[in-house]
């Protein structure tokens, strides 16, 4: 790997230098060829294994943990930081630079009495979801590899330590700006320094002045809205939408007790530590705005409040428009280039009626959408009909849907288009759990199989049909722990 060290050299007060502590008996558990290409790597080697496991130095790496704060479940925590993630620097690739981080690399000054380690199950889950979201077309950080060990660590019980090698376009979070506004008061110069760095690195078309700052914040608002629209359309629940888990670039970031929906449930909670459902699936759009408001508060020393509010007021429109675009494609509806607010509302109601029907009939979210690939939209009798209990209610919806759809001349092409946007394969929690259990037993084949299938989520892959089925009773709607 070839590195540059812009964050390390230009922002010395934004991190602590810390070196990883190696893990015993490191071995590859998973490797992403797709992610490796981003930083010009070929095959996993023993030398690379030793370097990324913390047992040997990586040439050109600087090793540091970033400091930030954040709002966690609504309350402000003044000092967080990378408690178990150590960044090596920005690795150069054919299409730009990517931060390389060792998640589980050992304790840092921000570990808050933790051991700085990640357990194998959480490392595998982060690897799988990073790559799954990418291949579904959702903005996300990436995962290069998972490195296992025989090092014992204690959570609820004894587990083994592992390292996820994460790639990110940037590790700058909403919480970075909050730290230098709230926790380090009177340091507007640091806010400006961080803001200028962010613009130069990731928004080179914007000037480092008030006009550029205003344009940048509006872009952050729009990117965040688009990200959450993706989550709602694909049926993804993040689980821990704290402001320190929000990427300034609008990428899915810092995965913990996430879940893809099995049965559609608007108020689905995937996080065992969130009994009141602050971060439930249906709450994500509102939390996205709330988090942006916290970021806006942190930026008031450098951007006037009126300008911040004006940008925040664009959030709902950006969210709805992107969500409509994604859902219209899923349904096969033509995009209305010059749609009116009334027409948009009609489409939202049509979509909403269908998801309500899904919830009332306890239908599988992804599999129901996939059924549109076998639908003859010109037929008065829908092949979806047998899935519903209240046939009158479905028939009324289907008639409204056909009226909005209009005439379809090439049914086969229409069906293929639906299959290209409605995935057959998603990372169901029970599939991840089965792969993790197999790894614990020394069998990597289920993990490798699942990873390869998730690389082509829209393909039929008939030999892997079992991975597309609804989960068994024990695996339906699994709620995960935050411990990792």
Curated annotation (Swiss-Prot):
Active site location: 244 (proton acceptor)
Role played: Nucleotidyltransferase involved in the post-translational modification of proteins. It can catalyze the addition of adenosine monophosphate (AMP) or uridine monophosphate (UMP) to a protein, resulting in modifications known as AMPylation and UMPylation.
Sequence positions that bind Mg(2+): 245, 254
Keyword list, A-Z: ATP-binding, Magnesium, Manganese, Metal-binding, Nucleotide-binding, Nucleotidyltransferase, Transferase
Family annotation (NCBIfam families): PRK00029.1
Species, as recorded: Shewanella sp. (strain MR-4)
GO molecular function terms noted in the UniProt entry: AMPylase activity; ATP binding; magnesium ion binding
UniProt cofactor(s): Mg(2+); Mn(2+)
EC number in record: 2.7.7.-, 2.7.7.108
Residues passing through the membrane, by range: none
Residues that hold ATP according to the record: 81, 83-84, 103, 115-116, 166, 173, 254
Organism phylogeny: Bacteria, Pseudomonadati, Pseudomonadota, Gammaproteobacteria, Alteromonadales
Catalytic reaction annotation: L-seryl-[protein] + ATP = 3-O-(5'-adenylyl)-L-seryl-[protein] + diphosphate; L-threonyl-[protein] + ATP = 3-O-(5'-adenylyl)-L-threonyl-[protein] + diphosphate; L-tyrosyl-[protein] + ATP = O-(5'-adenylyl)-L-tyrosyl-[protein] + diphosphate; L-histidyl-[protein] + UTP = N(tele)-(5'-uridylyl)-L-histidyl-[protein] + diphosphate
Source taxon at top rank: Bacteria
Pfam families assigned: SelO
Annotated family: Belongs to the SELO family.
UniProt-recorded name of the protein: Protein nucleotidyltransferase YdiU
């Amino acid at each position: 790997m070839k590195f540059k060290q812009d964050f390390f050299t230009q922002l010395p007060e934004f991190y602590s230098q810390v070196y990883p502590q190696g893990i015993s008996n490191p071995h590859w558990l998973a490797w992403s060829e797709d992610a490796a290409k981003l930083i010009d790597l070929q095959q996993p080697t023993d030398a690379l294994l030793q370097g990324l496991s913390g047992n040997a130095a990586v040439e050109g790496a600087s090793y540091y943990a970033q400091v930030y704060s954040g709002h966690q479940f609504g309350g402000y925590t003044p000092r967080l930081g990378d408690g178990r993630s150590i960044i090596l620097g920005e690795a150069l690739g054919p299409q730009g630079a990517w931060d390389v981080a060792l998640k589980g690399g050992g304790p840092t000054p921000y570990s808050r009495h933790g051991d700085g380690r990640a357990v194998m199950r959480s490392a595998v889950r982060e690897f799988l979801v990073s790559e799954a979201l990418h291949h579904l077309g959702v903005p996300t950080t990436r995962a290069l590899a998972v490195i296992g060990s025989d090092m014992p660590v204690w959570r609820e019980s004894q587990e083994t330590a592992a390292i996820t090698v994460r790639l990110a376009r940037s590790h700058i979070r909403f919480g970075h700006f909050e730290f230098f506004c709230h926790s380090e008061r009177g340091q507007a110069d640091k806010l400006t320094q961080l803001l200028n760095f962010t613009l130069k690195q990731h928004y080179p078309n914007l000037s480092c002045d008030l006009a550029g700052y205003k344009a940048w914040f509006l872009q952050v608002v729009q990117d965040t809205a688009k990200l959450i629209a993706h989550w709602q359309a694909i049926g993804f629940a993040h689980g821990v939408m704290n402001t320190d888990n929000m990427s300034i670039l609008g990428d899915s970031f810092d995965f913990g007790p996430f879940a893809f929906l099995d049965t559609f449930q608007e108020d689905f909670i995937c996080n065992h530590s969130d009994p009141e459902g602050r971060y439930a699936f249906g709450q994500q759009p509102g939390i996205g705005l709330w988090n942006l408001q916290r970021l806006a508060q942190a930026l008031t020393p450098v951007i006037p409040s009126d300008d911040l509010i004006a940008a925040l007021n664009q959030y709902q429109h950006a969210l709805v428009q992107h969500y409509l675009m994604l859902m219209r494609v899923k349904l096969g509806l033509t995009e209305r280039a010059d749609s009116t607010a009334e027409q948009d509302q009609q489409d939202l109601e049509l979509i909403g009626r269908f998801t309500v029907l899904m919830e009332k009939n306890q239908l599988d979210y992804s599999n129901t959408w996939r059924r549109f690939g076998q639908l003859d939209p010109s037929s008065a009798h829908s092949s979806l009909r047998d899935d519903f209990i209240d046939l009158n209610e479905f028939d009324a919806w289907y008639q409204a849907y056909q009226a909005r759809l209009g005439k379809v001349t090439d049914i086969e092409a229409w069906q293929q288009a639906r299959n290209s946007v409605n995935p057959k394969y998603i990372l169901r929690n029970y599939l991840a759990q089965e792969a993790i259990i197999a790894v614990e037993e020394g069998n990597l084949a289920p993990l490798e199989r699942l990873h390869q299938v998730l690389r082509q989520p829209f393909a039929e892959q008939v030999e892997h049909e079992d991975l597309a089925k609804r989960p068994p009773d024990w695996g339906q709607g699994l709620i995960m722990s935050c411990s990792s």
